[in-house]
């Protein structure tokens, strides 16, 4: 295990060693040394357990710094590089918005003309939109509404707060902002109808091939197989890779840090659409006043973002910065988190792409350090990572066991980390992160655990705080069922056992008046209580478990003792 950890750490820092020393300009106009930036990046990644991250910085409207860090697949110890294909998630939407503006420039689409007028039949007559048949507001929807996320739809019908999986209006189109992939998908139908071409064909013709984005597509391509990343969850476990075979303007794009930075650069240089079209696309169409972007239909308001005039343009979020107006876009799903922001007046942009659920937790601090830029991180949901304490396995081991109450939980020690699972709430094994020597938290949900000890110093229960809901779970003391070892088998256990990590430490198994005992020291001898031929415990010691290991011939060769950690004792 130690060898693997060293290899992993070395791989992460290998990216820094190979980087060429140079500087790049931050949003505030100041320059930062590349080595300093990379040190800050790798430190944040390690602290927050960000498995993989790629970064591109655009200066003078051109990609200047493009770098990959960490793993594309940690399970295989395979590293990211700048040609590694990442799932682009909602970065798909902003690229699609540019294609829409190209149709507007060509006079084929009017942003304010109801989109149903471009279709051969009423929208509710399409199978995907039959849910809208009872509400005539579908006739009001325009391309502007779709790109500005003001259609009135939920993000996706499966997220309908009524839990009916239906597509329906929650407000009249144009009334307010509510992020919606459904609106983008509907506009895709219109674009494909107007152009007479599938989305992928249109994207290849208008953007991918002209910009030499050879590793970008709305569909999974065979050439991606040789170098692609998988997502990683909060515990840095790999997630299954979805290889999409249906083009979706709202989120099926596969791309690389190198390719997408070409797109951002071309947009700044006026290569894809005119400056006039870009300004319209990135001008505020609707103000945003909600506390959080998601859930998309939430109505909790805040004045926190009044100062930056947070709003939405056409396919892009918009805000004011001290360095000029900016437009931005995110991409997010389990195991993936991306963010890009451009400031045209500075000819500057930055792109962050992470194949880790922990990635977004460093974006606030990362952008402040290497870009000199503050973003509406709370609205984005980019909650900064929490610092964790460093605890030994001896300390962690005392919390291992079964816990019972309104919920049932099992806590184990694995690879130097505490992990909890609960069949009661269908929670698979997940890491516990220490705040101090008795308090822990989960990353997958807002839950804290506080372990309580009795007067004897042993853990008796754990208190759970699950987003304000309190639970008390008592630690289960296992009942020990005795098993009688035949005296004829005693010689197999007798002898001296030395600690594998410290041969000077010794336990002697002896036959004392017909009872097998463990002589732990010159003054302490404890009887063994057997559950079977290989498992036993020390009498009177509730938190110690012993397992005798046999060779192929059934002879005892060592014993393992679990007590505040796992220790191996070799039979001499």
Predicted regions: what they are:
Residues 12, 87-90, 256:
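Hydrophobic transmembrane-helix microenvironments that flank and shape a buried ionizable site
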Residues 20-67, 201-205, 209, 241-502, ...:
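Catalytic loop of the DD-peptidase/beta-lactamase superfamily, centered on the K-T-G motif
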Residues 24-34, 42, 47, 62, ...:
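Active-site-proximal loop and beta-strand segments within enzyme catalytic domains
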Residues 52-55, 131, 158-159, 218, ...:
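Surface-exposed patches in mature extracellular/periplasmic domains of secreted proteins
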Residues 6-9, 84, 131, 247:
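Residue-level detector of alpha-helix boundary/anchor positions
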Residues 2-3, 93, 329, 571:
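A general lysine-centric signal
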Residues 1-23:
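Bacterial Sec-dependent N-terminal signal peptides
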